[in-house]
Amino acid sequence: MSNEVEQKKNIKTINDLPGISQTVINKLIEAGYSSLETLAVASPQDLSVAAGIPLSTAQKIIKEARDALDIRFKTALEVKKERMNVKKISTGSQALDGLLAGGIETRTMTEFFGEFGSGKTQLCHQLSVNVQLPPEKGGLSGKAVYIDTEGTFRWERIENMAKALGLDIDNVMNNIYYIRAINTDHQIAIVDDLQELVSKDPSIKLIVVDSVTSHFRAEYPGRENLAVRQQKLNKHLHQLTRLAEVYDIAVIITNQVMARPDMFYGDPTVAVGGHTLYHVPGIRIQLKKSRGNRRIARVVDAPHLPEGEVVFALTEEGIRDAEE
C-alpha cells in the first residue's frame, strides 16, 4: 500500500486533515463544518465565506475531505449496495407505505403537496412520532426536527398519536426539536444552523418543514420578485437535500397548491414553487380530500416508484388505513 493511500485511510476527522492549522479547523467547526462529510459536499465559495478563509484554502480542504471519503465514480453495483442501506419510516398506513415502497426514505427529500385539509400537517405530526419507534415497528429509534412556518404544530395531536402507539408521551415530546420560523430569512437561517445540531445529535433522523413555500410566497409576490424568490428557494432546498444525504436523514417538506386558470381539463391545481419544486425533491406525493376522513395519495414523481394512488384515513389515533 502506498504512503498516500495509507495517509488517506488515517484521515477520520477534520482534525486529521494534513496541512490545516488548528486555527482554521476551529473556524470550520464554528461555521458548522465539523465533519469530513459536510466539508466534502460544500462549495468552495460557501465554505470560504462561512469560515472566513481564503478561497484557495477552502478548495484545498474540500479536496482533502473528498479524497479521504473516497468520493469517486462508482459502479452501478456499488450504488445498488448503498441503496440497500437506505432506511424507511412507516407512515402508519400500510397502503401508503406500500405506495412508497416501505415508507419515507432517509437520504431523500419527500414533498407532500395538496390543498388545505388534505392531510399534509397530519402526516408531519405522525412521522415525527413514528420515527421514534424501533425499526421492527417501522421507526428508526430517532428524533425529529419540526420547522413550523404556519403555526399549525399541535402538541395535543402528538399526544394523541403517541398514546395510540403506547409510547411515553413526555419522552415523545422531548424527542421532537420544534421551532417556529417567522419569515423567509429566519427559515433559511434555521436550516443553515441545523448542520451543527444534527452533527452533535446523530439520533436526529427526520427533518420536517411545514410548509416550505408559505413565507417565500408571501414575501416575494409578483413576477418582478420571481427570480429572487426562486434563487433563494432553490438554495434552501439544496441545503436540506445535503443534510439528508450527509447525515442519513429523512427530509419531509409540505407545499401548497394553486389553481391554473389556463387548465381546461384534468386537475387544475399545481404545486406552488414552479420548476424549483418540480426538480429538487426526490419523491413528490400529491394529497387530495375524499369522503369523510379519507384522503388520496398519488405518486407524482419518483425515480424508483411506479405511478399509482392509494386511500388512507385521518383518524383520532393518527394516520391509518381506510376502512373498506
UniProtKB/Swiss-Prot annotation:
Disulfide bond entries: none
Keyword DNA-binding listed: yes
Keywords: ATP-binding, DNA damage, DNA recombination, DNA-binding, Nucleotide-binding
Residues given in the record as ATP binding sites: G114, E115, F116, G117, S118, G119, K120, T121
Pfam families: HHH_5, Rad51
One BP term from GO: DNA repair
Xref: SMART domains: AAA (SM00382)
Taxonomic superkingdom: Archaea
Gene3D superfamilies in UniProt: 5' to 3' exonuclease, C-terminal subdomain, P-loop containing nucleotide triphosphate hydrolases
GO MF, one annotated term: ATP binding
NCBIfam families: PRK04301.1, recomb_radA
Similarity section: Belongs to the eukaryotic RecA-like protein family.
Function as written in the Swiss-Prot or TrEMBL entry: Involved in DNA repair and in homologous recombination. Binds and assemble on single-stranded DNA to form a nucleoprotein filament. Hydrolyzes ATP in a ssDNA-dependent manner and promotes DNA strand exchange between homologous DNA molecules.
Protein's name in the database: DNA repair and recombination protein RadA
Species, as recorded: Saccharolobus solfataricus (strain ATCC 35092 / DSM 1617 / JCM 11322 / P2) (Sulfolobus solfataricus)
